[in-house]
């Protein structure tokens, strides 16, 4: 009579459902449906767990066979130096108990010319003896002869390694960032905008002074032209370059305001630009002296000086306004790119916030949750919009203040 077969053990199910394990999320382990699958109204399925460890499959490694027709021919191995008559077979035929004096004696058939082709045997920098003075050690001698028995470099060509660098990507460096940084250095506070006196005059607040506006205006024109050239380059879509360009434009507008009010932007003074402007205006107003301005070859002085000075600066602001159009387009493009990057980053963080690590997730084991590494984005989505708003607000304030100077003069 056959005994009944033992009951078959029920297979062990995984602790995490298939949906949570595939998404690498922590499962609530509720059966028949976990909280996540129940919330998403998805089928919750617990698969049979598998034993941890490596699975030995029936895969066999295939060793590629090389047919004799496709096998490369071996290079001929030559142990003879190019210009010498010494053969390694002669060395092997030498008795082991060869004496050192007999080895170097010229009576054994070797001449000075034969050994001159092997200078490594008589290297004076090596202080240790090559051979024992009583008997010749075969292995020490073979090691000492390894240098002159090397293959000539002409028999085996050196492989070309330059082909490995052909696939590397190369970046196009147009030098726009360097130009903008040079402009920023040129406009640094260490080079203040001074009220330059008329040639032959002293800049004295008590006896009168003169303003040389032409160099400031010409320099600002050159800077704005350089910025316009950089904006025409495709590299101007870079956020870091755009940020530096905006700083340069702000500096140029500050120089226009300083020229209109005869302010001095000195790095030694930590006060704001508005305080400097007010002090300079009050200084020239309190003196009550006549001031002259040089515009090209024209000299304007007397009561019309303040009006002319502010009017000239006001007429130059159209250059900044024309530059703002191209700069705004670049800022809009950079803002859209930053917004897309933020959306993509947020979606990745939403998926990876509860991610689990380790091989135990696929085996149904409890694995501690790992900390998601948040990537640092260089710019916020609203950063470039704020830059554009600040530039337009600064230009509007400069235009209004300069217009007010013209009216009051």
From Swiss-Prot:
InterPro entries listed in its UniProt record: AflR (IPR013700), OAF3 (IPR050675), Zn2-C6_fun-type_DNA-bd_sf (IPR036864), Zn2Cys6_DnaBD (IPR001138)
GO CC, one annotated term: nucleus
Localization (cell): Nucleus
UniProt cross-references to SUPFAM superfamilies, sorted A to Z: Zn2/Cys6 DNA-binding domain
Region (Disordered): 49-83
GO biological process terms, semicolon-separated: aflatoxin biosynthetic process
Pfam (any one): Zn_clus
Ranges of the DNA-binding region feature: 17-44
UniProt keyword annotations, A-Z: DNA-binding, Metal-binding, Nucleus, Transcription, Transcription regulation
Origin: domain of life: Eukaryota
PROSITE patterns: ZN2_CY6_FUNGAL_1, ZN2_CY6_FUNGAL_2
Regions of compositional bias (Basic residues) in chain numbering: 51-62
GO molecular function: DNA binding; DNA-binding transcription factor activity, RNA polymerase II-specific; zinc ion binding
Induction, as annotated: The expression of the dibenzodioxocinones biosynthesis cluster is positively regulated by the transcription factor dibT.
Membrane-spanning intervals of the chain: none
Functional note: Transcriptional regulator; part of the gene cluster that mediates the biosynthesis of dibenzodioxocinones such as pestalotiollide B, a novel class of inhibitors against cholesterol ester transfer protein (CEPT).
Xref: PANTHER family: MONODICTYPHENONE CLUSTER TRANSCRIPTION FACTOR-RELATED, OLEATE-ACTIVATED TRANSCRIPTION FACTOR 1-RELATED
Protein name: Transcriptional regulator GME11370
